[in-house]
Structure formats: structure tokens, C-alpha cells
């Protein structure tokens, strides 16, 4: 699957900028560099990992740009191939011109993620580290980048390696019983094997349980502000954003469509959605706003049900509560500066916070409540040793391995032939191997690397 042809792509985002970078990788990268780049000071051979200033010309000898160039000879490069970078003046035209020169000379335009794919295929990184690269690029908060860096440093791969080694040790003992049937596995040995598998299952469960927190850090949290009209929903959105994004008036029904904004609160990337007030109405425009608000409930990770704390809950409050009854709900009892009434029995069992958005009171408590609800592993920011799952693929593979280990324990309990146990252990070993890329099918690899941008 490894292709040694020379690939080229822009390594910087399109558009104007101070610097544009063109990257090459492959056996012909250095030859192509020397064909079109002339260092200002003559040298017989460019040293690896040194920047050289000079001129870049096309095939006719016309100067394209004054550039800085560097060659990183294998294996001390990102791909473990010869890698060349041209640092030119920023701007799409210059970057495209340099790429066109290399393409005309025999290089090939890189596919999305192909540089990282080559790093994986050449053994520089495993699949979890490759996935961490794109997570790091796309991270929207410090917590998310810390988790991605931990994975890029190999923390997840190390943990998966431990799991794989324990499974391999169990398999070796079971296969010994198959190869030497005259030496039956004694009861004590069976109990030891079962206990080892049980301990491994418990360790896997602890890692699996981190997925929801990791998913939120990686993908962000979709938070819906919901409730009847004039309870302070738009004021709450403006308070969280720190700016007057939504129109606020004393007239019920001012918000008639959804308003969405991205922000980071307490290390959490959020997509905040303000909605029309929920009530029965004859106004067709407002009615459409209510319908859209209801439709957003199903896709929300969290519904902030806003209640006017200075009034008793009414029919419209109960209607809004019913619409989000089966979702993750955090009740925001607003306007507590006006009055503090007892909590309605309709809210029994639901978590709540008290706020006065206009007085800017209670917002920190709201953010903390959201964080505690969804990120149980927030300490990863301070401790890179913590392993947190961020990919559904990783969770699915660990669940599959865990299930195989459970069936292996059952073969011991039932006194079944060791061949049955060996099958389950091999399945478990294959499952954990999928995470790091040891046993990953090509179609999964393709899906992973096509998520990358060209040039990475």
C-alpha cells in the first residue's frame, strides 16, 4: 500500500497571509527542490533540517519568488521519507505557481491526509496518533487540544498496548492447553485466567466510560435554550456570549426563529441555540418559530429549560417541560432578583440552577453545572497521563473486545473446550488491534484519512 512517488500540496490554508508553505514528500523530493531552488550562497549539498534563503524559478528560469527552503531527509521527517518545504510569500497565486512547477516536473498532487497516511504506513505513528493530528487541528478549546496532545504523545496507544499484551498472554496459556491436551487446565488455573480477564474487563470499562466526555470535548456540545416567552432566554444567550446577539424586549414572542452561535465556556466548546418562546399561538409566524424550536429539541445534547423564578409555573411552562421531558435537561430558574418562589413539584428530580441574567448573577454556576454534567474527566487538562476516548471507532472496538472477553470467561465457567476460549481471545486481540491500526481494514483507513485536509 506504500507508494514511493513524490507528492506535493500546500501546507497552509488558502488565501492571503504572511507566509505560504508548499510541502513535498517522496524519493524525488530533494531532486525536485534542487532543480528549481538556488540558495543565495553556493553550497555543494544542502544540510538536512536547515533553512536556506534563495530564489525559486520555473522551468524557463523565470523567478517565481524569493523563498526559504528546507529538506528533512528520511527517516527524520514527518513521513519518514525525504520531505521538502518551500516557504514563500503568502498568497494563493504564488503557492499555486510553485505547486504547478513541481507538478509539471513529475510530482503528484497529494490526496487529503496522504502525508499523515505515509507517516502511519511507514511506522512513524500509529492510527490513534494519526487521528489525534486532525483532532488537534480541529480542537476548539484548551481541554480538547490537551486531550488530542495526550493521544498524539501515545498515551492511548500505550494503554491499548497493555490491553493487547494481557490478552496475548491469556491466549498463550489457552493455546498451550490446546497443544498439550494431556495437561488439562487445572481449576486453579481456570480461576486465575477468569480473574485476569475480569480485571481486564474492569480496566476497559473505565476507559469506555470516558467516551461521552471525550466526544463532547472533540465535537462540542449542542445546547438549546428553551422555554415559554419572556422568561429571559435571549438575555441568557447574550449573557453567555458576552454580547447583545439576540434582540431583547418586554414583548412576548420577540424571538421567532432560532439563533445559533459558537463559544467556549469553562473549556467546553458549545453551540448555543436560542429559540422562540413555547406557547399556543394563532400567529402563523410565531407558530412556525415554535415548531422550529420543538424540532431542535431532538438534536440537542442539553436543553436549558428557562423558568421565570418570580412567577408560579403556568400552562406554557408545563407545555415546554413536556416537549423536553425525555431529553437531557438543566432547569434555569431565572429572574431570581425579583422573587424566589419554592421549586414547583413539576420539576421534581430535575437538576436546576438559579440565575438573574440581567444582574449577571448565577452564570458561573450555570457553566459549572454544564461542565460537571458532561465532562467528568476535565482533569485531563492538568494530567496528560489520563486516557480519554474521543472517537466512536475506539469505543466500538473496546466494547467488542470486552464482549469477547466476557464470552471467554463464560467458556471457563461452562468447562468448554479451550478451543472455544481461544476463538474469543483472538477476536478480542483483533478488536484492540483495530484501534492502533494493526488489524484495521483498508476501508476504515480510507474513511479516517479522507477527513484530513490536503497538505496534512
UniProtKB/Swiss-Prot annotation:
Its EC number is 3.6.-.-. CDD domains: trmE (cd04164), TrmE_N (cd14858). SUPFAM superfamilies: P-loop containing nucleoside triphosphate hydrolases (SSF52540), TrmE connector domain (SSF116878). Pfam families: MMR_HSR1, MnmE_helical, TrmE_N. GO terms for molecular function: GTP binding; GTPase activity; metal ion binding. K(+) binds at residues 230, 249, 251, 254. Residues 220-375 form the TrmE-type G domain. Binds 1 potassium ion per subunit. One of its GO terms (biological process) is tRNA methylation. Its main location: cytoplasm. Homodimer. Heterotetramer of two MnmE and two MnmG subunits. Belongs to the TRAFAC class TrmE-Era-EngA-EngB-Septin-like GTPase superfamily. TrmE GTPase family. This is tRNA modification GTPase MnmE. The gene is mnmE.
